[in-house]
């Protein structure tokens, strides 16, 4: 492709740009794909509007025609507004909790001399404590798909059987904690971003209440995504319990395994703040990069998923959904990667 289509021959040309204010693009007559794509939009004006309320107000007032990041609390209102429509679709992003399961002791816990998260019964107790349907209903306003694994359905290696969302069972969770030696629970700090994922801090707040019901006293520490991600990526990581979201641009499970499950070191496991390490699993993950027999490769992927699911390394919550709001005479569809492909738009309905 790149041999015959030089950089700078895309569907739109840059006209002007004011950083964090406005970017203006116009259709490029020399686009190599002209005639192959509708190209109904001849000029694009991107406005940066950080406030959810201001963004929605701009759409309703006619200042803008389209809003990409529609707040879940405003979807119903926009759907009911005259002259408006909302397109909803699945996003390529799983939301989940991670735990420090590899350190001898949790820095933020009142348990000293051992690590509660190192016991799989404790991890399974936390899995059972989460009421995913309640989060979907009350926090996400229905705009989420409860999950049992941290891979969206369109990723190679996805297993519907493994993705069955665990039912909330506080009593079973309490029993698991007691069996693990924590009948009265324990305390730990949960690190959460407040500006990265849809209602991220609200998800954490709801989960803190759910963990409290089984006796785990979780102190919530929420902050901007930059410092939050630094806690996860530092060496060693500086978090015992954290919220994270993960998209899969390759649409293949190897992308998940190599960043989140592989033993951390060098370029491997760079987002694996769980301290999980399984050398046999590492070898299988590495083999995926060279295996040319697709049947064998997919069998290895399935085997890896069974192992990491059994080990309960992460606590899946849900997959995000996307909502694009626009004037009713526009028809712009959602894409799992949350990209707006304006060249695919043929014009007004």
Q: What are the functions of these language-model segments?
A:
Residues 2-54, 77-96, 101-102, 171, ...:
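Aromatic-rich, solvent-exposed beta-strand/loop patch
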Residues 7, 46-57, 69-73, 195, ...:
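Short helix-initiation/N-cap motifs at beta->coil->alpha
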Residues 11, 128, 145-179, 196-200:
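Structural transition elements
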Residues 53-63, 77-81, 205-214, 227-239:
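Short helices/loops that flank or line small-molecule/ion binding pockets
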Residues 74, 111-155, 199-203, 308-316:
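Periplasmic-binding protein-like
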Residues 90-106, 113, 227-289, 336, ...:
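Acidic-aromatic pocket-rim loops
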Residues 120-128, 136, 214-228, 257-328, ...:
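Extracytoplasmic/peripheral linker and loop segments enriched in polar/acidic and small residues
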Residues 324-349:
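Long beta-strand-rich cores associated with HINT superfamily self-processing modules
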